Amino acid sequence: KELLQSRSAADADSIIHFKGDDIEIAFTYTDKCGEECYSFVNGWETRNGGTHLEAFRESFVQVIYEFIPSKNIRRSDIFNGFAGAISIWVEKPVFVEQMRYELGSTTMTSYPDSISINDFVVCFVKNRLCSLLKQNSWVRNMILERVIALAQERKRLRPLDE
């Protein structure tokens, strides 16, 4: 949460924050164009993301699609102005390169029957975000109206591109 406040100049009250065992996520929307995502594994910043960040993004999209079933919504509509961060704890993480910029691990622990990082993150994000959107109409409306407005703006500007 503090990271998003400092790096994206977001208002502390607008940052949504979930914390669980071995995982913490925070996100908000800003007036900036594009997407800002930060990811961490065991306290190390993974600048190039990895399996945990992809699972975070994918589960976020899945939840939004559950609430806006329209086929006219694109990922870019969901993530324009999005600022988010994910931090997970993985036993014996494997990184793609020596600098630890990207997580390459696929499971949470080294045990053969360990849950995959993808399943762990997707389950956490979907459960927490769905609950929030069902229970808090202000947050639900803020997010969904923004996404719909961005999709409509994109469609309105499309003839200008052709």
Feature locations, PLM:
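GHKL-family ATPase ATP-binding module
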Residues: K1-E162
